[in-house]
């Protein structure tokens, strides 16, 4: 177990959370808040519908610094250009030609790589996730099981 928050920040500093095509700015703020709670501070946004936004700031609560330091990109390729390991996420179980991991396996890959590499964890749009083309920019794909009736 980590002894203090500085160790957590050091451990997670190479990890970037990338949100693609976010349609509701409140989700950006909520993501920033969740990130900060977990010790993740690097946020990248790819073509968000609305950012910056009062709704994002309101939902972020004490994670305004994560929003203020967020980088905005026009495409996913640019957002992950500095990363050696790119993990695409999906609630759908897809047939893709690269490794599909469960969340535990994905966490193990991140832990192994974080010591020496920049890492991106990519989340897709609220309504349809990542496109196959966007998943093609990822080294790994993590399938996050969810309720089949509401897999947003």
For every predicted segment, state its role.
Residues 1-152:
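Post-transcriptional modification and biogenesis factors for structured RNAs
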